Amino acid sequence: MAKRGGNQVRIIGGEHRGRKLPFPDLPGLRPSGDRVRETLFNWLQPVIINARCLDLFAGSGALGLEAASRGAREVVMLDQAAQVVRQLEANRDLLGLTQVQIIKADALRWLEQYPRPFDVVFVDPPFAANLLSEVCAKLEDRGWLASDAFIYLEEDADRDFPDLPENWRLYRQQQAGQVRFGLARR
């Protein structure tokens, strides 16, 4: 658990609205801010209930736990840091979110396995890792997306989004502070 007054993320909507959850203080761990999440989940509001969601770089859990709080049927959250995974499991259990599965794995390697299509995928890797393009290609090429899937992308505001697979359309995009974020649709 984070120290008192330490790093916390707040669930901003749904069943667990207002709950504050700790997350570890690790380099590169940067939760999507409240304003960004509010905008994102307003965009996703018509589709998030009963959706199958994949959070590839779960980190603080802000996106995956928010999706579960707002009625997603299933949420699979990945992170490769053991400390992060332990905290995500504790937060999931604290909220009683039985539809959330947490996996300790490298996202790129995990995407090599046999796919199960998801309705909504959150792609918010550490900015310094520069993984957006490779992850988007794997999601498309390996069959991880439902036919009408939504893909959330987050990047440093100083960079443009990479070229997306040809059958994706950048549906919405905005900037908030040092973050560029967008929603693509397959």
Language-model features and meaning:
Residues 1-186:
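Class I S-adenosyl-L-methionine-dependent methyltransferase catalytic core
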